[in-house]
Amino acid sequence: MQFSKMHGLGNDFMVVDAVTQNVYFSPELIRRLADRHTGVGFDQMLVVEPPYDPELDFHYRIFNADGSEVSQCGNGARCFARFVRLKGLTNKREISVSTQTGRMILSVTEDEQVCVNMGEPDFEPQTVPFRAAKAEKTYILRAAEHTVLCGVVSMGNPHCVMQVDDVSVANVALLGPVLENHERFPERANIGFMQVVSRDHIRLRVYERGAGETQACGSGACAAVAVGVVQDLLNENVHVELPGGSLHIRWQGPGHPLYMTGPATHVYDGFIHL
């Protein structure tokens, strides 16, 4: 099986063409391939499939390193767009894809940056999903003897975002896994630790569901800005600084789609016998 290794700001992926190759991945096989000592090593596996809808270009599947399938990965979406062009699966600069939960438009710029229409952030608890009687801008969660104030939003996957004074010393290793598996998130959640530098600039670390802390999380950056906008902490154009690099997020507020722009890097191509 042929594959490519790619990354979006250090969030790394094994990308597989299932349009021209016949492939099947069990959770056990994905876990083996994800192992950084004995496999390929990656945060997520991205699989390019033929479209289920003839009006779309591709179907986009995402698997975490633990073998679980998820419905959204923003950094992965940018790599997906670069991959299908690099491999000659399309020459379009505007690429339409379906995911587990909806549709996305991926736009490749002249300098090979990728702008992703991530859709409108959804704050309804039942959509996230999150156990709450009604939608609030802020919730109180208790975890590991800590009381946490956070915002909760779906970007096609569940996110919990808390504001911290200094992201460099945030206790991500402790609070990340505890909140990821909090009883109020029936499908677990991605946990964002956001430092507001100014109304146009945040620093962010994300503990990803099923992957742990990563160098960057595109949907996590989108979620942090969405929460920051509704809490009136941020303007509509925000520079998001992550450990692996920076993204630009634009959101005009409720009723509008959110846009994420950033790089996607091809590292190497490989072949593996399964």
Curated annotation (Swiss-Prot):
Source organism per UniProt: Yersinia pestis
Pathway this chain belongs to: Amino-acid biosynthesis; L-lysine biosynthesis via DAP pathway; DL-2,6-diaminopimelate from LL-2,6-diaminopimelate: step 1/1
Known EC number: 5.1.1.7
Similarity field: Belongs to the diaminopimelate epimerase family.
Residues annotated as binding substrate: 11, 44, 64, 74-75, 157, 190, 208-209, 218-219
The keyword Isomerase appears for this protein: yes
Site (Could be important to modulate the pK values of the two catalytic cysteine residues) residue list: 159, 208
Domain of life per record: Bacteria
UniProt keywords, alphabetically: Amino-acid biosynthesis, Cytoplasm, Isomerase, Lysine biosynthesis
Enzyme's top EC category: isomerase
Gene this protein is translated from: dapF
Entry-linked InterPro entries: DAP_epimerase_AS, DAP_epimerase_DapF
Active-site residue numbers: 73 (proton donor), 217 (proton acceptor)
Protein name: Diaminopimelate epimerase
Function: Catalyzes the stereoinversion of LL-2,6-diaminopimelate (L,L-DAP) to meso-diaminopimelate (meso-DAP), a precursor of L-lysine and an essential component of the bacterial peptidoglycan.
Cited HAMAP family: DAP_epimerase
Subunit (UniProt): Homodimer.
Gene3D superfamilies per the UniProt record, alphabetical: Diaminopimelate Epimerase, Chain A, domain 1 (3.10.310.10)
